[in-house]
Swiss-Prot record:
SMART domains: G_patch (SM00443). GO terms for molecular function: nucleic acid binding. Keywords: Nucleus, Ribosome biogenesis, rRNA processing. This is Protein PXR1. It is found in: Nucleus, Nucleolus. The keyword rRNA processing applies. Residues 235-245 have a biased composition (Acidic residues). Its main location: nucleus. Disulfide bonds: none annotated. GO terms for cellular component: nucleolus. Residues 25-79 form the G-patch domain.
Length: 346
């Protein structure tokens, strides 16, 4: 309705801190949480959880959200530009002039680099604090019972020493048994090898004949394979040479076709340019004739009995053509260009 609408005056002083929304208990979120059994002032989640010990007053307060307008990491801050480049190198040079040793200068340089790295990490990722695993799992921390351990250690040490000696004796006995078993196994293996050699002397002739027959069959098989390979190799070489020749011919044909296409495109472009230049030159000549005709007619009117034909071109187009013609004449004239660009001719 504009100015005729009813005017509603609002007082901004009723809620200057903008806390009315936090005290409002009739919104959708409060109603939904109440339906699930939650009440104002309570924590979210089960009350008897293992991590409920670590809840504080901040767990029941409102969540604060900050708008992130940059692409930096969480907690990172923009470079404020208060760092002077080259200042550290200048300080090192002054220290050398004052007679400071190279080892001390290198130590200071490493300390500065470590400090800069820590500052960068804190800006990029925030301060990192390592917590024990119990906090992550949610266990309750319990102090160790030192008294019970002290009582157990204060007992009689003599029986413990006796048990240790017994265990050592048992281990020594086991080691002796293992060595005896290994020696017996070696002896048995040697005896078996000797018996195998004695029994296998009679059958050497038969095995030698079988081995010779097998070697002959293998040699014949290898010779046949070599002959086949020799026959197949020239045929494969001829096929490869033919394939290469055909590929080269195709490549040459494709190159020729591409060159012809490029020539045709160039010729078409040249023809189009020539036509445009001819059209533009003819239109300029016509426009010059028309402008001269209009000027002469306006300056010296001639009375005649017959009606003269009126040009159908608008006055705006005629003025624009005249302006373009004048501009071209000025661009061709060197003296006019010097006047435009404020160049003094010597």
């Amino acid at each position: 309705m504009g100015l005729a609408a009813p005017k509603n005056k609002r007082k901004l002083g009723n809620d200057p801190n903008n806390t009315r929304w936090s005290r409002n208990t009739e919104n959708f979120g409060h109603r939904m949480l109440r339906s699930q059994g939650w009440e104002p002032g309570q924590y979210l989640g089960p009350q008897d959880a293992s991590h409920a010990v670590y809840h504080t007053a901040a767990s029941a307060s409102h969540i604060k959200v900050a708008l992130k307008e940059d692409n930096l990491g969480l907690g990172a801050k923009m470079n404020r530009g208060d760092e002077c480049t080259g200042l550290n190198a200048f300080k090192e040079m002054l220290a050398r002039l004052n007679g400071k040793s190279e080892a001390a200068i290198e130590k200071d340089k490493k300390a500065r680099e470590a400090h800069a790295m820590n500052v960068y990490v804190e800006r990029k990722f925030g301060t990192m604090r390592f917590v024990s695993g119990g906090f992550l799992v949610g266990d309750v921390i319990q102090e160790k019972k030192e008294d019970a351990e002290a009582e157990s250690t204060d007992g009689t040490p003599e029986p413990a020493e006796a048990t240790v000696k017994k265990e050592k004796k048992r281990k020594a006995g086991r080691d002796d048994d293992d060595e005896a078993q290994s020696k017996e196994e070696r002896r048995r293996a040697k005896k078996q090898k000797k018996s195998m050699k004695e029994t296998g002397s009679g059958g050497d002739d038969v095995t030698s004949e079988e081995d010779s027959a097998k070697s002959k069959s293998k040699k014949s098989h290898k010779s046949k394979k070599e002959k086949k390979r020799r026959k197949e190799e020239p045929a494969s070489d001829e096929q490869e040479s033919e394939d290469e020749e055909s590929r080269e011919k195709r490549r040459k044909k494709e190159k020729k076709e591409r060159k012809e296409r490029r020539r045709e495109k160039r010729e078409k472009k040249l023809k189009k340019k020539q036509q445009r230049e001819e059209d533009s030159s003819s239109s300029e000549a016509n426009s010059d004739d028309e402008t001269t005709g209009v000027d002469t007619g306006a300056s010296t009117p001639v009375a005649s009995g017959t009606s003269t034909p009126v040009s159908q071109v608008s006055v705006r187009h005629l003025a624009r053509r005249r302006f373009i013609a004048q501009k071209r004449m000025a661009m061709k004239d060197q003296q006019a260009l010097n006047q435009i660009f404020m160049i003094k001719s010597s």
